[in-house]
UniProtKB/Swiss-Prot annotation:
<dbReference type="InterPro" id="IPR035654">
    <property type="entry name" value="LepA_IV"/>
</dbReference>
<dbReference type="Pfam" id="PF03144">
    <property type="entry name" value="GTP_EFTU_D2"/>
</dbReference>
<dbReference type="InterPro" id="IPR000795">
    <property type="entry name" value="T_Tr_GTP-bd_dom"/>
</dbReference>
<comment type="function">
    <text>Required for accurate and efficient protein synthesis under certain stress conditions. May act as a fidelity factor of the translation reaction, by catalyzing a one-codon backward translocation of tRNAs on improperly translocated ribosomes. Back-translocation proceeds from a post-translocation (POST) complex to a pre-translocation (PRE) complex, thus giving elongation factor G a second chance to translocate the tRNAs correctly. Binds to ribosomes in a GTP-dependent manner.</text>
</comment>
<dbReference type="Pfam" id="PF00009">
    <property type="entry name" value="GTP_EFTU"/>
</dbReference>
<feature type="domain" description="tr-type G">
    <location>
        <begin position="10"/>
        <end position="192"/>
    </location>
</feature>
<dbReference type="Pfam" id="PF06421">
    <property type="entry name" value="LepA_C"/>
</dbReference>
<feature type="binding site">
    <location>
        <begin position="22"/>
        <end position="27"/>
    </location>
    <ligand>
        <name>GTP</name>
    </ligand>
</feature>
<dbReference type="InterPro" id="IPR005225">
    <property type="entry name" value="Small_GTP-bd"/>
</dbReference>
<dbReference type="InterPro" id="IPR006297">
    <property type="entry name" value="EF-4"/>
</dbReference>
<comment type="similarity">
    <text>Belongs to the TRAFAC class translation factor GTPase superfamily. Classic translation factor GTPase family. LepA subfamily.</text>
</comment>
<dbReference type="GO" id="GO:0005525">
    <property type="term" value="F:GTP binding"/>
</dbReference>
<dbReference type="GO" id="GO:0097216">
    <property type="term" value="F:guanosine tetraphosphate binding"/>
</dbReference>
<dbReference type="Pfam" id="PF00679">
    <property type="entry name" value="EFG_C"/>
</dbReference>
<keyword id="KW-0547">Nucleotide-binding</keyword>
<dbReference type="InterPro" id="IPR031157">
    <property type="entry name" value="G_TR_CS"/>
</dbReference>
<dbReference type="InterPro" id="IPR038363">
    <property type="entry name" value="LepA_C_sf"/>
</dbReference>
Length: 606
């Protein structure tokens, strides 16, 4: 079924779905595509919109996707639905705000057996702040454990939305999906915009195709956009000619023009990876708009790690791969870095640990790169004794203790929603992570906890630990609050008396001895035995806090002596001893990749 172009603006509906991980968002999208005939039965793969292999394997949505469908309403009119899919994980909240900027409405999907989760609350507030019409939907209503009344009450108490007319659906069986589409058309307002004004289109997303160059997903706010139009990117002032324009149905389908209020893609032969920045405004070259659209708030990376190619010949390929991923993922930051231990690579900034894992996995899969990742660290502020304030995102560049007046660490505000029976375990975890409780509220049978926590304690394993102490029921949303002075020190690792810059950590002084001892022990297990003793030391400045030794392998040099004179044996042993001494002075120790990752495991409780 084709999509006709003659849709008037009053029949366009732009919407997205807000939901926590696993609440059935991608399955609802599949049902919409099925009912509106976007794909034939043969082409309907499960989770059509989660097109990345990685998304299907992990069962999460990483990249926002878009799809345009035709829906024949109960009044006989044909409506044009533009659905923009959004991720649900806390690391990808930036993608969500980007998707919502292109919509007039949102479906808040809540699992009827689990209830409201913190991430949905945060995204829902973002939608309400942006003036979207939010329609509450209860999914998985077919489950025996579904409690629609309790969940409706939670939506009203926690979010403050009227849930008396919440729609009850089961995306798996298809129950209630028709009613949901009808309610969507009735309750979400049509887009506002002026077809006669000069063109203004917002770039929601961009990605790179090796044959076509940059493909941009745009939302046309004013005017219209046709192939052969000459366009200008407002921030860079660069001119391009539109080669193709079209819609995702979810297959790519070309159209004669993108109308006011519509969402579609354009291909304009942009070969430069930075040619169409996300959040930018597209206008015509001749009749151009003077005022750009408000873009998205620039997002700051929270976690930094070094990425180094195992083979130094891959350095340029890594640079190219990062540039292409950066186009599609505005939250990724990178700059060149050199390490004495690992050679040339990049210092990369991420939104969180999941974001980091996914970028690393995409680089390895999509670009066939073999990488070493150093331990992730957060950004610290350092006040030097001269009164300068430095931003430190790499422990190896922290100034010497004598030059530091104070070190400030980033503090976050964490909102945790947890069922009452697990609240004790969650509070215990927050205390262990140096958290300060700010608020505790009872909401139905859930408890809302507000904590201030150091970001460095949260990035490594807080999310996994929170899930394990609450049997998977607690949910977390956090945002940066401020920098606060703390007693932090740099923990260095010395192997045979040499500092290995890639293994340095910034830790709280109270934990330094424990972390140092644990790190040294881990290294002892991972570093292969040599023909000489390898000393592993953990140090704070010049003060050694822990030491272990990888014992030497012993070669039996006296095996060929049968009985005979003891001096013959002694001579061979002395010769071996001298050889080992010389070897220890010049011999370098090969550190395996697992050793760099062991830093991540330090401080984790099994």
């Amino acid at each position: 079924m084709g999509l006709s172009i003659s849709h008037s603006m009053k029949n366009i509906r732009n919407f997205s779905i807000i939901a926590h991980i696993d609440h059935g968002k991608s399955t609802i999208a599949d049902r919409f595509i099925q009912i509106c005939g976007g794909l034939s039965k043969r082409e309907m793969a499960q989770q059509v919109l989660d097109s990345m292999d990685l998304e299907r394997e992990r069962g999460i949505t990483i990249k926002a996707q878009s799809v345009s469908l035709n829906y024949c309403g109960r009044n006989g009119e044909v409506y044009h639905l533009n659905f923009i899919d959004t991720p649900g994980h806390v690391d990808f909240s930036y993608e969500v705000s980007r998707s919502l900027a292109a919509c007039e409405g949102a479906l808040l999907v809540v699992d009827a057996s689990q209830g409201v989760e913190a991430q949905s609350v945060a995204n829902c507030y973002t939608a309400i702040e942006q003036g979207l019409e939010v329609v509450p939907v209860l999914n998985k209503i077919d489950l025996p454990s579904a409690e629609p009344e309790r969940v409706c009450q939670e939506i009203e108490e926690i979010i403050g939305l009227d849930a008396s007319d919440a729609l009850q659906v089961s995306a798996k069986t298809g129950q209630g999906i028709e009613e949901l589409l009808a309610a969507l058309v009735a309750r979400v307002p049509p887009p506002q915009g002026d077809p006669a004004s000069p063109l203004r289109a917002l770039i929601i997303d961009s990605w790179f195709d090796n044959y076509l160059g940059v493909i941009s997903l745009v939302r046309v706010v004013d005017g219209c956009l046709k192939p052969k139009d000459k366009i200008k990117i407002m921030s860079t002032g660069q001119h391009y000619r539109v080669e193709k324009a079209g819609l995702f149905t979810p297959k790519r389908r070309e159209v004669e023009q993108l109308l006011t209020g519509g969402v579609g893609y354009i291909i304009a032969g942009i070969k430069d990876v930075d040619g169409a920045p996300v959040g930018d405004t597209v206008t015509h070259v001749e009749q151009f708009a003077t005022k750009a659209l408000p873009g998205f708030k620039a997002v700051k990376p929270q976690v930094f790690a070094g990425l180094f190619p195992v083979d130094s010949d891959d350095y340029e390929d890594l640079r190219e791969a990062l540039a292409k991923l950066r186009l599609n993922d505005a939250a990724l930051f990178y700059e060149p870095e050199t390490s004495q231990a690992l050679g040339f690579g990049f210092r990369c900034g991420f939104l969180g640990m999941l974001h980091m894992e996914i970028i690393q996995e995409r680089l390895e899969r999509e670009y066939s790169l073999n990488l070493i990742t150093t331990a992730p660290t957060v950004v610290y502020q350092v006040l030097t004794s001269k009164g300068e304030v430095l931003r430190i995102d790499n422990p190896s560049i922290l100034p010497e203790p004598g030059q530091v007046a104070e070190v400030r660490e980033p503090i976050i505000q964490a909102d945790i929603l947890v069922p009452q029976q697990y609240v004790g375990a969650v509070i215990g975890l927050c205390e262990e992570k140096r958290g300060t409780q700010k608020q505790l509220q009872y909401l139905g049978n859930q408890i809302s906890l507000n904590y201030e926590l150091p970001l460095s304690e949260v990035v490594l394993d807080f999310f996994e630990r929170l899930k394990s102490v609450s049997r998977g029921y607690a949910s977390l949303d956090y945002h940066f609050s401020r920098f606060q002075s703390a007693d932090l020190v740099k923990l260095d690792l010395l192997i045979n008396g040499e500092r290995v810059d890639a293994l340095s950590l910034i830790v709280h002084r109270n934990q330094a001895h424990y972390r140092g001892r644990e790190l040294a022990e881990k290294m002892r297990e991972l570093i292969p035995r040599q023909l000489f003793d390898v000393a592993i030391q953990a140090a704070i400045g010049a003060h050694i806090v822990a030491r272990t030794t990888v014992k030497a392998l012993r070669k039996n040099v006296t095996a060929k002596c049968y009985g005979g004179d003891i001096t013959r044996k002694r001579k061979l042993l002395e010769k071996q001893k001298a050889g080992k001494k010389r070897m220890k002075q010049v011999g370098s120790v090969e550190i395996p990749q697992e050793a760099f990752l062991a830093v991540l495991k330090v401080g984790k409780k099994p």
